[in-house]
């Protein structure tokens, strides 16, 4: 189980720090596959059938639908992200510190002997905090959506850790909200891209017209 | 409670959902677009009043149904306010949209149905008992509003809506984290009916962590400083009726969240009260100061709104009856004041096509109805007597002073004065200062629905200021509901 969570964190790191947006999305897909595996494993280990359904839903939403949406939004643009606020080497160093420190620190909760809380809690908190750090440091709109995806993955794992205490439909409804939010994000990005492309074409036309007049 | 009562409670949110779906399916047919939303909101208002009657008859002044619904006076007050705001927004919109958003004519049905869905989810959130479910429906209603902010589909609108979506979604996730931690440390689901018991039993450091998470989440939702970044842009870029919907309904969801979580913490932990009052003072002061130099009328009102919301947040965490009463009353007055100001600005935009103060001044003609209503709104923001806002501000002032926060009450008076001054200065510049000699004064015809919507809000603001006993029963039951839940 621990290995799965560490793999999730490593893949999240690649998704967050990769300059190439397409590669980031592929990392997210792999990351989501590990999340599905972790949810399925927890369902099997603790004999909670609702987790199988949640794993299936995750497979559908986090592995297929949302990454496809994001890939669609980067279809007509340059695949490298807009320069972030923090320089790349510093960002990588900070990411490693944030991920390792928070995950290690959150291990304290494991000693608290809380009744029936699943082990995804520490990983969830780590993803949440790391996603927030990424959100602050990035400037690219698509990258921000990827960061939001990471924050949401964190919340998802936190909710999963409380599943024994929750009505089962809460996680399904939260996933629905997540899909709606991501859809709106991508709707806005696509519309913005359209406008930016139009503006670029208009600028190009004007420059050409000026050149013609000069000639 | 018998089934018929459950039916009435459910109709408050089912009616807008049903009618929104009709509007969505029917497309842009004239009568359906304009009549169905109004009918659905009227049904909701009627059912809310019936539930209020039931609540008045009950001994405990709380209606609980199978751990699903928790309805107290504050739920009723919020529902009524959101329904009235939605109704007035819908009535104001047709002419405004027809002139300024004619290029989006084929999407008007989506506009109305989004307002209805959002209202329905808010209404549902206000009667639920489980904190997780409250979060889910508050978030859903918030997300839907994106479509309305970005309705014009221009670059600036899209940027503003992206900012809104990002800040609100991430911000409100903090409150979800707060709920998760609360459940984690108590080992049980948290309901409004038991939140006070569990909060009181928490160790102090855990309670502080949870409360800070709730503060970040719901302060972001309300648009209070330092989590306000989304608010000025969203207010200024969205269509004016939607700005009123944002100011009167969407940001109020944040206050609902504050009342249901942060107020409970502040009743048990003095540190939370102090923290919230410090943050609120920042909002009051900086909101007013930032408003002063704005050249966009909508942004100026947005910053004044941030300042005013600081009043409300500071009052809602005071462990006293008059504090909570003042806060609840100011929620209503804030909605009315901002409604008047944004609707008046909407009329100016309708007439001159801009919300920039200098551009309006250049082309300003003869609009007979706007200036008095804008002046009333500005005077109310300044906290002048005769308006409801005077009574609520003065109540908050006394409550803060009594609770030992004299410095906050001084900031309150100061920021009210600065905000009022900023608005009055702009109003005098726009409506009273001498016009250039060669300027032609055109008589501009305004749609009756727009003027009437603004007039209704102005009338209510004055009525609540002169005859506060009209609104007092609702305020009393809401205040007692909050105090009962939090103790």
Outline where the language-model segments fall.
Chain A
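Alpha-helical transmembrane segments of multi-pass membrane proteins predominantly involved
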Residues: 1-215
């Amino acid at each position: 189980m621990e290995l799965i969570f560490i793999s999730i964190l490593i893949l999240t790191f690649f998704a967050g720090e990769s300059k190439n947006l397409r590669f980031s999305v592929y990392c997210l897909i792999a990351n989501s596959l590990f999340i599905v595996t972790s949810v399925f494993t927890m369902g099997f280990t603790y004999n909670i059938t609702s987790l199988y359904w949640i794993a299936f839903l995750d497979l559908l939403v986090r592995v297929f639908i949302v990454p496809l949406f994001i890939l669609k939004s980067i279809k007509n643009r340059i695949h490298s992200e807009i320069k972030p606020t923090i320089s790349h080497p510093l960002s990588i160093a900070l990411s490693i510190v944030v991920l390792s420190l928070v995950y290690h620190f959150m291990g304290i909760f494991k000693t608290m002997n809380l009744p029936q809380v699943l082990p995804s809690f520490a990983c969830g908190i780590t993803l949440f905090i790391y996603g927030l750090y990424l959100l602050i440091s990035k400037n690219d709109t698509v990258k921000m959506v990827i960061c939001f995806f990471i924050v949401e993955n964190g919340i998802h794992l936190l909710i999963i850790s409380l599943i024994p205490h929750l009505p089962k439909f809460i996680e399904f409804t939260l996933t629905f909200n997540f899909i709606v939010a991501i859809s709106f994000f991508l709707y806005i990005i696509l519309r913005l891209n359209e406008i930016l492309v139009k503006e670029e074409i208009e600028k190009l036309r004007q420059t050409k017209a000026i050149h013609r007049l000069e000639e | 409670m018998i089934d018929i009562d459950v039916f009435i409670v459910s109709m408050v949110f089912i009616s807008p959902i049903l009618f929104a779906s009709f509007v969505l399916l029917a497309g842009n047919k004239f009568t359906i677009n304009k009549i169905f939303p109004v009918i659905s909101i009227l049904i909701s208002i009627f059912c809310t009043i019936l539930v209020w009657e039931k609540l008045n008859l009950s001994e405990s002044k709380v209606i609980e149904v199978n751990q699903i619904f928790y309805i107290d006076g504050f739920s009723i007050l919020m529902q009524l306010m959101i329904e009235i705001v939605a109704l007035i927004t819908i009535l104001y919109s047709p002419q405004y949209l027809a002139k300024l958003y004619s290029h989006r004519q084929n999407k008007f049905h989506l506009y109305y149905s989004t307002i209805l869905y959002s209202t329905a989810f808010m209404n549902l959130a206000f009667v639920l008992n489980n904190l997780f479910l409250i979060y889910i429906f508050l978030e859903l209603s918030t997300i839907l509003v994106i479509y309305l902010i970005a309705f014009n589909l221009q670059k600036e609108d899209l940027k503003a809506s992206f900012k809104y979506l990002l800040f609100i979604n991430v911000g409100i996730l903090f409150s979800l984290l707060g709920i998760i931690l609360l459940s984690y440390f108590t080992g049980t689901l948290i309901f409004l009916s038991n939140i006070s018991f569990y909060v009181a039993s928490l160790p102090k450091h855990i309670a502080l962590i949870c409360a800070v998470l709730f503060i970040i989440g719901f302060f972001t939702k309300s648009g209070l400083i330092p989590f306000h970044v989304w608010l000025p842009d969203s207010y200024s870029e969205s269509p004016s009726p939607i700005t009123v919907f944002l100011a009167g309904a969407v940001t109020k969801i944040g206050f609902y969240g504050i009342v249901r979580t942060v107020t409970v913490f502040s009743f048990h932990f003095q540190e939370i009260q102090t923290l919230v009052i410090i943050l609120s003072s920042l909002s009051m002061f900086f909101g007013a100061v930032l408003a002063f130099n704005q050249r966009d009328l909508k942004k100026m009102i947005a910053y004044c709104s941030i300042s005013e919301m600081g009043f409300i947040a500071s009052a809602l965490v005071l462990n006293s009856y008059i504090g909570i009463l003042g806060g609840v009353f100011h929620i209503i007055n804030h909605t009315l004041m901002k409604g008047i100001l944004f609707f008046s600005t909407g009329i100016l935009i309708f007439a001159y096509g801009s919300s920039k103060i200098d551009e309006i001044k250049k082309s300003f003609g003869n609009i007979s109805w706007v200036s008095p209503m804008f002046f009333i709104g500005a005077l109310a923001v300044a906290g002048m007597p005769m308006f409801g806002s005077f009574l609520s501000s003065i109540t908050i002032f006394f409550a803060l002073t009594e609770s030992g926060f004299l410095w906050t009450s001084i900031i309150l008076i100061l920021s009210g004065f600065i905000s009022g001054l900023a608005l009055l200065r702009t109003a005098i510049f726009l409506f009273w200062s001498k016009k250039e000699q060669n300027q032609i004064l055109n008589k501009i015809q305004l749609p009756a629905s727009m003027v009437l919507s603004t007039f209704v809000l102005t009338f209510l603001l004055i009525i609540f200021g002169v005859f506060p006993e009209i609104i007092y029963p609702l305020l009393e039951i809401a205040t007692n509901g909050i105090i009962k839940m939090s103790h």
